[in-house]
Amino acid sequence: MKNQNKKILLLGSDGYIGSSLYDYLTNLKYDICNVDLFWFGKMHQNTIQKNYDELTVEFINKFSHIILLAAHSSVAMCSNSLESCFNNNVSNFIRLIEKINNNQTLIYMSSAAVYGNNDKLVDETYPITGGLSFYDYTKICNDNIASLYPNKKIVGLRLGTIGGFSKNFRCENLINSLATASIKSNKMIITNPENYRSVLGMKDLCRSIHAILESDTIKNRIYNITSLNAKIIEFAEKIKNINGGELIVNDSLPTNYSFNCDSSLFQTDYNFKFNDTVETIFVDISKNLHMIVSNLKRTPR
C-alpha cells in the first residue's frame, strides 16, 4: 500500500512527539488528520481540537492507521489523581480499541518506566510485577488490555526517555535537560548518577513509526523502543565532552527509576536499526533551539 492510500489519524498531534511526528510524516506525503486538546499549545493550524474519546466509530473507521499519543504522558502529570489519569490513559484507550475494526492498525505509546527499578538489560518477556507510580500502572494496564484483543492489529511501543528537538519541547527529559543546560548556562546538575536510563532519539522514534506504517505484517505485540542505554552520569559526561561546562552531582532527590531495555525484537520484526546517539540528539537540539514554540513543563492534570 502506497503512502497516498494510507490515511493516518494522529491523536495528540500537537504535543512533544506529535509535533515532530506530524512534520516527519507530512514530508513523506502521508495523508494525516490531527486531533489534540492543546494542553501545551497549538502547533498545527489544521488540528481538530477535541478529546479523542468523543470521536465516533464512523469517523475513526475512515483511517487505515491510528497513532495514539494523547495521554497523561509523564509521572508528574499523573501524580495528583489516579482517577483522571486512569480515565484518560486507560478508559479512553479501551473505548478506542472497541471502535477500531480488524483491518485498522492502532499504534499506541507505552513506556520503559514499567520496568521500574531494574539495572539489568531486559526484553519484553521480563515479568512486570507492578508500577512505581500512577503513570506506570496505567501503562501496564494498557499493555495487558491490548493483549486481550488478539485479532486486532495493535502495536504497543515501550518508549525510552525521548530526547531531541520538537517545536513543543519537553525540557525536563534527560538529554533535553542536559543539553539545554549545557548550552544556556554551561552547567549541568544531575541526580541519581548511577541509575540507568534507556534513551530514545526523536528521529529514531519517527523512523520506527514509519517502519510500522510501511509494514504489511502487523503483529499484536509490545516492543521496547530505545536508541541507547547508559547510566545517567554517563549521558552527562558525554554531553560535557561534546560541549564542555561544569557537571554537578546532587543526590538530594533520589528516585527508584532505573531501566535498561533491549530493543532487539523490534529491530528483528521490522528490519530496523536505531541510529541516534547522544551526539546526534545533542546536535538536533542545539541547532533547533531557536525553533521551539512551546516549552511548558508537564504538570499534574
List PLM regions with ranges.
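N-terminal Rossmann NAD(P)H-binding glycine-rich loop of SDR-like oxidoreductase domains
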Residues: 7-27
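Active-site loop of classical SDR/Rossmann-like NAD(P)-dependent oxidoreductases
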Residues: 42, 230-232, 250-270, 276-280
